[in-house]
Amino acid sequence: MKKIKVLCVDDSALVRGLMTEIINSHPDMEVVATAPDPLVARELIKKHNPDVLTLDVEMPRMDGLDFLEKLMRLRPMPVVMVSSLTERGGEITLRALELGAIDFVTKPKLGIRDGLIEYSEVIADKIRAASRARLRAPAPAGHAAPLRLRSPFASSEKLVIVGASTGGTEAIREVLQPLPADSPAILITQHMPAGFTRSFAQRLDALCAVTVREASDGERVLPGHVYLAPGGETHMRLGRSGANYVIGLQASEPVNRHRPSVDVLFHSAAEAAGGNAIGVILTGMGKDGAAGLLAMKRAGARTMAQDEASCVVFGMPREAIALGAADEVVPLADISERILTRLGDRGHRV
């Protein structure tokens, strides 16, 4: 079996050692070299031609973002960022994903050894996914011109429900940016740790015509608003309070190894919204959301999955398609327009 070759770049000797220990404990991957900074890494990339690079965000001599930008321009390769679990770390990591990084892992604030060892399987899964991922061009700057709804949107009954994981931050941006300000409400679960989703929501809000915010427990769901499930500590559910849709945040156990879980959101939308919803499953590894999308379809919702060619990781959409959960399989660049087309369709299903 050919092993995945990994180069670890981090200014901390402790983190380099722990990442090496974790990666080498899995039989399908190995650390071929480590580097304390990007300048050393540059020479080691030429020497070892690694399959995946793990890259610390903040380092001396050249920071991780500057190096990533140069790397993606001159020698694109799969990169997993290693980020601090802080608000600043979240903002920098989101920028790294815009520049082309595949995914990220977070360093615990305290007890780095125990924290990283605890997430050994998560780190290995992200490296495996990165080794198979499709590289994409960095995100263009600026705003996309909003599309128009094909028919005036007046009903607060209609909803769009979205789930994503690896590669999802950029896929979500591409879906939301063209949508007009009078779009129906949109609820999104993206696999992210605590502290990162607020920065993500703020970044999207600055780029989009719709209002994007991190969801709060008990708040009423309004048209023209996008609600992002808070990362790490709760699941987001859609519920009803009289004639209104409301958001519920529940601190229960992870589902499909994730909290928030896409399946939890999709199942709740099937029950609360039925045929008034559109369900969309985007790029990501694993199967979270596949069963929930099928539940939405059976409840009368229109459903779609991102196609393989445009996915960074074709995991969650593939599982949904295999279950028969997707009414249609759509390239990422066309999903916004397909959503608006479905919203303009007549009939009991949106």
Curated annotation (Swiss-Prot):
CDD domains: CheB_Rec, REC_CheB-like
GO biological process: chemotaxis
Residue span(s) of domain Response regulatory: 5-122
Gene3D superfamilies per record: 3.40.50.2300, Methylesterase CheB, C-terminal domain
InterPro entries: CheB-like (IPR008248), CheB_C (IPR035909), CheY-like_superfamily (IPR011006), Sig_transdc_resp-reg_Me-estase (IPR000673), Sig_transdc_resp-reg_receiver (IPR001789)
Keywords for the protein's UniProt record, in alphabetical order: Chemotaxis, Cytoplasm, Hydrolase, Phosphoprotein
EC number: 3.1.1.61, 3.5.1.44
Protein name: Protein-glutamate methylesterase/protein-glutamine glutaminase
